[in-house]
Amino acid sequence: MSRFLEDLRSLSSAEEFFSFLGVEFNPKVVQVNRLHILKKYQTYLKACDAEENGESVSRETHKRCLERAYADFLTSDARSEKLFKVFQSEAGKAFVGLDAILPLAAAERSESKVNSSAEA
């Protein structure tokens, strides 16, 4: 593994990625969208990796991908980008299975029996 990739793997915050790759950024934009920017960066990197036939993606490619991901959030927002599952589901279309409801109903019945016994 190259020194560049080792250093890259040691980064833990979005700000560290921006500094390490030499990408200028507005801290307010990154603070609000950090996870979304990094997720989009990862998406762009995967596309570049496929184009480069699995060869190690260069530092310049990493920088371009991060710049592109950051630029997306200068003109868009997390809800519009829909990178995470919570933003991908349609509003009002949440699914709650019976296996989640039945234990709650049973617990409520047991609790009401205990309460009515205590009152008597």
UniProtKB/Swiss-Prot annotation:
Keywords: Nitrogen fixation. InterPro entries: NifW. One of its GO terms (biological process) is nitrogen fixation. May protect the nitrogenase Fe-Mo protein from oxidative damage. Belongs to the NifW family. Homotrimer; associates with NifD. This is Nitrogenase-stabilizing/protective protein NifW. It comes from Rhodospirillum rubrum (strain ATCC 11170 / ATH 1.1.1 / DSM 467 / LMG 4362 / NCIMB 8255 / S1).
